């Protein structure tokens, strides 16, 4: 079942009456909340600007991170509201099923948010290897280090590379109204990480990736969550009980988390002819939480370096996908470390 006014099913056809009810209840809260937040932040700006500025001055944060983040919050809230309004307009004129229109909306939304990050937080993004992206269908394996990774990759693949990205996203992102509505009208899959039915989730990923063409890219974050040292140690400790050899091998990781194999394998099964690229970046370290963003913005300007590297599918020949993915991830980690040391 599909509520065409609010967006279609989440890639794997998992919607049913209970899901529809939950979707309606969620959006009745999130959509007005973001719109009211945009209005409130704008009206109250004469109050929060001097207060947040005073906080930054008292804490000797010359980069003024609190002011900057609140400024970005205003932009985000208005862009979210605009995106939802346009999605509603597309429904009213009978174009809620138009993939082309919603990809255009996604490109507009991502570009404006990146512009807002640049204007408010001083985030500058340098891309290397954009011309290395092969013809589609493409499977992109992306590093996950910050709250901005999904946004940056949407801008990268959609606005810069001119591709149509399909995402494997965590279901919690449904609380972002624009992602929730627009993201369910184009081929994405919102994975339930707490689900006891792993096969259903993997089948949902496969269904999302089927039918990809020359302009399509399936994007997955193999780490499954934002990286930080505490998570890395916890995951490696758990891994030692299941696969000691793999845990020993991945102990060399200093910045990335151990990659999860199942989702990547599902994409490879669904797109056996697809080209593979790896996307990694340096510059978002420590920005996995809002407090981390405030700390990092207060210390230095953010320069995000993104490298795109093609990976040949024939390198998988004769070895398990897990071993191949581990070697790719260890290589990325070493490159990230080298750039951080030199920066």
Task: Label each residue range with its predicted role.
Residues 87-109, 119, 134, 138-197:
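Catalytic core of membrane glycerolipid acyltransferases/transacylases, capturing the structured
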Residues 5-138, 152:
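Membrane-anchoring hydrophobic helices of lipid-metabolizing enzymes
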